[in-house]
Regions:
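Beta-rich strand-turn-strand
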Residues: 118-122
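C-terminal edge-of-domain segments
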Residues: 137-154
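Short active-site-adjacent structural elements
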Residues: 106-107, 133-137
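Pyridoxal 5′-phosphate
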Residues: 126-130
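RNase III-family endoribonuclease catalytic core
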Residues: 1-115
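Structural preference for beta-strand elements that scaffold enzyme active sites
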Residues: 95, 123-125
Length: 154
């Protein structure tokens, strides 16, 4: 068994709908990013890649890879799942913690967990918190996400 940690942060834009944890959130602005800006998915991918010893999200989905421009989080997870399965690695579970004032994750937590779990083929749990007004997340400028993954190597 191996564990991996992934982190990501994105600032809010002034246009578009927020995409986070595999869902669209109309109560928050879009997150800037090369793909759809889904910081939860990026942290998830980073954690799984780290646990598997396969690099990081920048190596697999980086801004130097035009095929990932505008990609959805589910598309990224699908590619990650194929990569992991091709190495005979089993993903036991992923835990995600979203830090920010918006969107309000608790309203759709179960839905987000299902979307990400279905895409990954392994259990994904999501927690959320705020920083009580401190830092860029507390000022409502963006979100920060931490993820942990547990995998079984062949």
């Amino acid at each position: 068994m191996r564990t991996g940690v992934g982190v990501d942060a994105h600032k809010f834009s002034t246009d578009g709908i927020c995409k986070l944890a595999g869902l669209e959130w109309e109560d928050a602005n879009r997150l800037d990013g090369h793909s759809d800006g889904d910081a939860a998915v990026h942290a998830l991918c980073d954690a799984v890649l780290a646990a598997a010893g396969l690099g990081d999200v920048g190596e697999v989905f980086g801004v130097d890879k035009p095929e990932w421009k505008g990609a959805t989080g589910v598309q990224m997870i699908s590619h990650l799942r194929s990569l992991i399965e091709s190495k005979s690695i089993t993903i036991n579970n992923v835990s995600i913690q979203i830090v920010g004032n918006a969107p309000k994750i608790s309203k759709r937590r179960d839905e987000a967990q299902k979307v990400l779990s279905d895409a990954l083929g392994s259990p994904v749990t999501i927690g959320a918190t705020t920083t009580d007004g401190m830092g860029f997340t507390g000022k409502g400028e963006g979100v920060f996400v931490i993820a942990n993954a547990l995998v079984q190597l062949p």
